[in-house]
């Protein structure tokens, strides 16, 4: 005998769209030497935060990822957390 599917649909949450910070502020650039800016896009475990979390556009998220990777190579940012 087949089960009836009586689940309620999930309530719709309002989608909060975030604007890209770098698109709204045209003069702000992404540089690997600006560690204060790059640390806002890195989690406490050392991972780069996702685009849906940061609210950046595709191009600026890629630029942030490249800048973080360059800063890690020059030892300005840590590669990851040493605690497990």
Curated annotation (Swiss-Prot):
<comment type="similarity">
    <text>Belongs to the bacterial ribosomal protein bS18 family.</text>
</comment>
<dbReference type="InterPro" id="IPR036870">
    <property type="entry name" value="Ribosomal_bS18_sf"/>
</dbReference>
<comment type="function">
    <text>Binds as a heterodimer with protein bS6 to the central domain of the 16S rRNA, where it helps stabilize the platform of the 30S subunit.</text>
</comment>
<dbReference type="InterPro" id="IPR018275">
    <property type="entry name" value="Ribosomal_bS18_CS"/>
</dbReference>
<keyword id="KW-0699">rRNA-binding</keyword>
<comment type="subunit">
    <text>Part of the 30S ribosomal subunit. Forms a tight heterodimer with protein bS6.</text>
</comment>
<dbReference type="GO" id="GO:0070181">
    <property type="term" value="F:small ribosomal subunit rRNA binding"/>
</dbReference>
<dbReference type="GO" id="GO:0006412">
    <property type="term" value="P:translation"/>
</dbReference>
<protein>
    <recommendedName>
        <fullName>Small ribosomal subunit protein bS18B</fullName>
    </recommendedName>
</protein>
<dbReference type="InterPro" id="IPR001648">
    <property type="entry name" value="Ribosomal_bS18"/>
</dbReference>
<keyword id="KW-0694">RNA-binding</keyword>
<keyword id="KW-0689">Ribosomal protein</keyword>
<keyword id="KW-0687">Ribonucleoprotein</keyword>
<dbReference type="GO" id="GO:0003735">
    <property type="term" value="F:structural constituent of ribosome"/>
</dbReference>
<dbReference type="GO" id="GO:0022627">
    <property type="term" value="C:cytosolic small ribosomal subunit"/>
</dbReference>
<dbReference type="Pfam" id="PF01084">
    <property type="entry name" value="Ribosomal_S18"/>
</dbReference>
């Amino acid at each position: 005998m087949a089960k009836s599917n009586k689940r309620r649909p999930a309530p719709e949450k309002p989608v909060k769209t975030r604007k890209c910070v770098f698109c709204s502020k045209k003069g702000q650039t992404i540089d690997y030497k600006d560690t204060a800016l790059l640390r806002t896009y890195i989690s406490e475990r050392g991972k780069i935060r996702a685009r849906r979390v940061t609210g950046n556009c595709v191009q600026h998220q890629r630029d942030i990822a490249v800048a973080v990777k360059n800063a890690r190579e020059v030892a300005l940012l840590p590669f990851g957390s040493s605690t497990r």
